[in-house]
Amino acid sequence: AQCLVGSEMCIRDRSERMLIVTIMVIVGFMSGVLSNTGTAAVLIPVVIGIAAKSGYKRSRLLMPLVFAAAMGGNLSLIGAPGNLIAQSALKNINLSFGFFEYAIVGLPILIVGIIFYATIGFKILPNKEAPADDDSVFDQQQDFSNVPKWKQILSLVILVLTLLGMIFEEQTGIKLCIAGCLGALALIVTGVISEKEALKAIDLKTIFLFGGTLSLAAALEKTGAGELIADKVIGALGSYPSPYILTFVVFILCCVMTNFMSNTATTALMVPICLSIAQGMGADPRAVLMACVIGGSCAYATPIGMPANTMVVGAGGYTFMDYAKSGFPMIIIATVISMIILPIAFPFYP
């Protein structure tokens, strides 16, 4: 992937702004069909290499990269862990989101975000020299010249087939998790990667975080704590809260939480609460959960909101305030876009 995508990002006398557009487009759409964290991890060393060759400062290129990864995660069901958490909760009540349904809100946010950072937002991006003592693993360029062409082609074929299996889950009867496992197994069986390499690629931190927060979410639901919080939220808004105001409150609450917790943990924690709110009002749970997931993805203002943000702190020489300064305007933009689209595409009372 680094070899193929890197060739598309090559300099070709592009201006710095156009390079940011190219990076964000590629990262955004790759994050929609792969994991947003995985996409960022693959392309960070590519962008660092481009910065070195072009003479542009990496701090100006890496932050748009991780922001685009977060935005792109909202293009499909598999773009971010939070998307699947909401989907699992909906399936328990015989509802679901379509594979690309998140893109109804996510795609406009990505498009406007790209335009913003290529124009007005360009001026607020960090403009720092690379740290002199940076020894990040992402700074180490990997040589893919010895990788056989058949492995590159076969890996792409398996990726496409795996994605098709995920997209047509209902038609094939094969669950998302099974399709993903079959794709990974195919890579090992065909010799594209070894079993050791496959195991090394598994992020145990993410798995334990996912499992732990889902357990916490289940506890909130079974003990009635989720319902209690839901009642407090509804009570604070009055006997008959406006669906629009409630959508805004859920969205902002998830925005704030995701920047100080992980976005996955925020979604896992808020999903049962949002379900309780929807059921208490007799509203469509899909409307509340969409606001929860999109709000939970707005982890732009801190380096701890999502793993990709943390990955580039050292390489970009960023401070906490760099994220706040560059990311807060994007949160405002995402909020405005969401508050326009959500009530239309996902009404509380369809």
Question: Where are the language model's segments positioned?
Answer:
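Single conserved hydrophobic/aromatic residue that forms the stacking wall/gate
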Residues: 1-6, 10-11
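Hydrophobic transmembrane alpha-helices that form the pore/transport pathway of multi-pass ion
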Residues: 13-75, 81-93, 263-295
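Juxtamembrane and boundary regions of transmembrane helices in multi-pass small-molecule transporters
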Residues: 14, 54-67, 73-85, 89-145, ...
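Transmembrane alpha-helical segments of multi-pass membrane transport proteins and ion-pumping complexes
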Residues: 15-19, 28, 32-41, 84, ...
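Hydrophobic alpha-helical transmembrane segments
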Residues: 17-25, 39, 62-63, 103-107, ...
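Alpha-helical transmembrane segments of multipass membrane proteins
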Residues: 28-29, 50, 89, 163-167, ...
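Structural signature of hydrophobic alpha-helical transmembrane segments
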Residues: 36-40, 109-111, 174-184, 235-246, ...
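Hydrophobic transmembrane alpha-helices of multi-pass small-molecule transporters
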Residues: 101-231, 247, 330-335, 339-350
